[in-house]
Amino acid sequence: MSKRIAGPEIERLIQLLARVPGLGPRSARRAALHLIKKKEALLVPLGGAMQEAAEKVRICSCCGNVDTSDPCTICTDERRAPATLIVVEDVSDLWALERAGTMNVRYHVLGGRLSPLDGIGPDDLNIKGLVERVASGAIKEVILAVNATVEGQTTAHYITDQLSNFDVRVTRLAHGVPVGGELDYLDEGTLAAALRARTTL
C-alpha cells in the first residue's frame, strides 16, 4: 500500500484527473500540481468552468451533439444545408469535421459503433433516430463518416441496409493515402483502399 502524500482533496483531484482519456496517474499528478501552483489563474477558473458545464451542457435531442442548448447550435443554424447529413460515431468526430470546415451541413451522432464482441448492438446506438430523420423525407444524402475499422465498416453496412428503402443517397468517406503521406510508410490495407477508391484526373 502506497503512502498518502497529500490531503484527501488533492488525492481526489488526482484520481479524477487520471480518469481523463490520455492522462494516467503520473500525468494526473503533474497536472494537479500545475493547477495547484497556478491556483488563481487556472484552478479556480477551471473549477468554475467545469461547474458551469456540468449544469448547462445538454445532449441535442435531434443529432446527439453536446451543447448548452437543445436543439444544438448546429441544428438551429439555418445556413446549413438541410438535405445533407453526415453520420459520425462520436461527438469528437463531429468536431474534427467542423474544424476541417469543408462542408456546411448537419450531423447525426451514433454514440459509438456496432461491436458484438463488446455487446454493443443496434439498439445501443442512435440508429433509430437516424432512420426517423431520413424517413421525414428532408434528407437527400447521408454521408457515413465512420472510422475505417472492422466495427466502423460493420456499422456502415448496417446503416446502409436500414436506409435502403428510402429515397436517399448513401455515401461514405474515401479511404486511402492521406495528404502529405508517403506510400512507403502506409500499411497494406490503406494502400488497397486507396487503389479501390482511385479517381480519374
From Swiss-Prot:
May play a role in DNA repair. It seems to be involved in an RecBC-independent recombinational process of DNA repair. It may act with RecF and RecO. GO terms for biological process: DNA recombination; DNA repair. It comes from the Bacteria. Pfam families: RecR_C, RecR_HhH, RecR_ZnF, Toprim_4. Coiled coil: none annotated. Gene3D superfamilies: 3.40.1360.10, 6.10.250.240, RecR Domain 1. One of its GO terms (molecular function) is DNA binding. InterPro entries: DNA_Rcmb_RecR, Rcmb_RecR, Rcmb_RecR_Znf, TOPRIM_dom, TOPRIM_RecR. A zinc finger (C4-type) spans 60-75. This is Recombination protein RecR. Residues 83-178 form the Toprim domain. Keywords: DNA damage, DNA recombination, DNA repair, Metal-binding, Zinc, Zinc-finger. Belongs to the RecR family. Signal peptide: none annotated.
